[in-house]
From Swiss-Prot:
Any coiled-coil regions, as ranges: none
Organism field: Ehrlichia canis (strain Jake)
Identification of the protein by name: NADH-quinone oxidoreductase subunit N
Family from the record: Belongs to the complex I subunit 2 family.
Signal peptide: none
Record GO terms (molecular function): NADH dehydrogenase (ubiquinone) activity; NADH:ubiquinone reductase (non-electrogenic) activity; quinone binding
Swiss-Prot/TrEMBL catalytic activity: a quinone + NADH + 5 H(+)(in) = a quinol + NAD(+) + 4 H(+)(out)
């Protein structure tokens, strides 16, 4: 029985085994070799997940974990996003000790286990695995004062988040007497008078997830951590954990808490609206690019959360499309940011970039306009689908609010373009990409943004069919 279950966790076993073996090999092998082997481990894990792609839902180890098509696709996206981070680490030419890439593998192990969790026990344990590795990665650069400072801030606030989650789990178990997700679903579905304590437990768990997503008002750690950590770690923070927790949240809301939709819908509307306001007005006075994009990320999360709150097949499809395009845009963005030293990642260093590197300036401009939601770029269709879902489901005032705040947020995206094209250079910092591999990745992301409108209908249909097949419909 348990051997049959083992087949479904081969990706996780392979990944954690690879991490432990590489940790030992790091003593005798060159650190660059370890980074390459870490990347290969992630890609092999992608292949294993693809080979073991499970269409029908399978419960593993008496319901401790779950495997189905949705979870498998989510794992593949998480693993590929993580692979892009390690690829950028390799081609950036910057020195990182061998433990860095191994810690990323451990973090990814925690994240793909988290997305497959099917009980409160596996949920909390995998949540803590990824949290502990992220604590270490945040303050990995011992020589940088800001790195240590951001690591301490992240540790303290994340520990508080873990305490809130544990308290929520204890309340949820205390009132429902259930540990498995299916048991919790049955409890909420079959009881008309749901105890207030059980609802409070759910709210506390959602708060801890909002913290990891950097949704407002649980975003306090984001600007300092983005600025203080190395740029490659900032890229990891902005892409991989966010992707995981969006997929996880969608799964929990649809599989475990559909009967509480009226309760969590109001919470998510409030959190998403607060997020876009904090993003739009918080980013305006930022000059450090990593801090600026940390606030921008809060706004993007707000869009994804409001789309999740609507809870229909179309709105959930809009969330996934938004997430995928967000990942692509961030990969292109960090192709630029990774060229900076961590202390020189300043808006003023882009002055006159059009004259020094016109191709780079054009690529940045395309990515900024796409993030702002300017047609016909990819980012426009991501925001359009979210807003149209709001209108179709009667949330017209919220849709208008989001559109107006989105127009305000265009200010800081256009400010970057203005600095590149119209300000005279007074900095010795030369932003150029001499690495051909980085150039290729940057141009690829720009091409995706430019030609996405040709394929947008097909992408919508594929995602909608995928979600409908997995019973994510409203």
């Amino acid at each position: 029985m348990y051997w049959n279950n083992f087949v479904y966790i081969i990706p996780e076993v392979f990944l954690v085994s690879s991490s432990l073996i590489l940790l030992l090999l790091g003593i005798v092998l060159n650190k660059k070799v370890i980074h390459v082997l870490s990347l290969i481990s992630l890609l092999v894990t992608v292949g294993i997940v693809g080979i073991n792609l499970e269409i029908e839902p399978q419960l593993i180890f008496n319901g401790l974990l779950k495997s189905d098509l949705y979870i498998s696709i989510a794992k593949i996206i998480i693993l590929l996003s993580s692979s892009s981070v390690l690829f950028m680490l390799l081609v950036s030419g910057k020195e990182y000790c061998y433990e860095f890439s191994i810690m990323i593998l451990f973090a990814v192990f925690g994240l793909i286990t988290l997305i497959a969790a099917n009980s409160l026990l596996s949920f909390y344990l995998s949540f803590e695995i990824q949290s502990i590795t992220l604590y270490a990665l945040t303050c990995f650069d011992k020589s940088a004062i800001k790195s240590s400072e951001s690591g301490i801030k992240y540790f303290v606030l994340s520990a508080l988040s873990s305490c809130i989650m544990l308290y929520g789990i204890s309340m949820l178990y205390g009132y429902t007497t259930q540990v498995g997700f299916s048991g919790i679903y049955n409890f909420f579905s079959n009881n008309e008078n749901i105890p207030l304590g059980a609802i409070l437990g759910v709210i506390l768990i959602l708060i801890s997830i909002f913290f990891k997503l950097s949704a407002s008002p649980f975003h306090m750690w984001v600007p300092d951590v983005y600025q203080g950590t190395s740029t490659i770690m900032t890229m990891f923070f902005s892409i991989v954990p966010k992707s995981t927790f969006i997929f996880l949240l969608m799964r929990i809301l649809n599989e475990v808490l559909p009967s509480l939709s009226k309760d969590w819908q109001q919470i998510m509307i409030c959190v998403s609206m607060l997020s876009i306001f904090v993003s739009a007005f918080g980013a305006m006075r930022q000059t450090n690019l990593k801090r600026l994009f940390s606030y921008a990320a809060i706004g993007h999360i707000g869009y994804m959360l409001i789309s999740l709150a609507i809870n229909t097949t179309v709105s959930n499809a809009a969330t996934i499309m938004y997430l995928l395009l967000y990942v692509v845009m961030n990969i292109g963005l960090f192709c630029i940011l990774i060229q900076y030293d961590d202390d020189d990642c300043n808006l003023l260093n882009l002055k006159g970039l059009h004259n020094k590197s016109p191709v780079i300036a054009f690529c940045i401009a395309v990515i900024m306009l796409s993030m702002a939601g300017i047609p016909p770029l990819a980012g426009f269709f991501a925001k359009y689908d979210v807003l149209s879902s709001l209108v179709e489901n009667g949330f017209i005032k919220i849709a208008v609010t989001f559109a107006l705040v989105s127009a305000v947020s265009c200010y800081y995206y256009l400010k970057i373009i203005k600095v590149m094209y119209f300000d005279l250079s007074d900095s010795s910092c030369d932003v150029s990409i001499s690495n051909k591999k980085l150039c290729f990745v940057l141009l690829l992301t720009v091409v995706v943004n430019l030609v996405f409108f040709v394929f947008v209908g097909h992408v919508r249909n594929i995602i909608s069919y995928f979600l409908h097949f997995n019973f994510f419909n409203g």
